[in-house]
Amino acid sequence: MLALIFFIFGPMSGTRYKILRAARLLFNEHGVAKVSQRTISDHIAISPGNLTYHFKKRDDIIEALYFDLVEAMNESFALVEKSEPSFELLYELTRSVNKNLFDNRFFMIDFIQILRSNDKIKKHYVG
């Protein structure tokens, strides 16, 4: 999953990782509409300029989290393709997918809003 972020957005610095982790937490707690770049920078005690250096817009943060989720889901399903079918495999797939969705629950809650406001995610999702 980090490999995809590296491919799309470049190498991940410690600050970049902290921003994404904080944004995910705040989006999950408060919803996308109530979290600004300032909220995120305040949460991790960095300047707004430092956050903007890594992510020009809030949508860039949402995109990074979206593609991180996509990669995590792809990894979950890749396990199925490489293995013999079994109840254990079905359990592991279900657990993994549910964990990914729970860890990024703001996408499920605010998905319509995200699709309406973010053309890059909409294009990827719709195909």
Predicted ranges, named:
Residues 1-14, 25:
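N-terminal intrinsically disordered/low-complexity leader segments
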Residues 13-20, 63, 67, 84-91, ...:
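Non-membrane alpha-helical structural segments and their capping/turn regions in soluble enzymes
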Residues 18, 26, 30-60, 64:
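Helix-turn-helix
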Residues 43, 68, 96, 110-114:
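Short acidic/histidine-centered micro-motifs embedded in hydrophobic/aromatic stretches
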Residues 64, 78-110:
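Hydrophobic alpha-helical connector segments
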Residues 67-74:
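Short, basic, alpha-helical segments at the C-terminal edge of helix-turn-helix-like DNA-binding modules
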Residues 102-127:
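Short secondary-structure transition hinges
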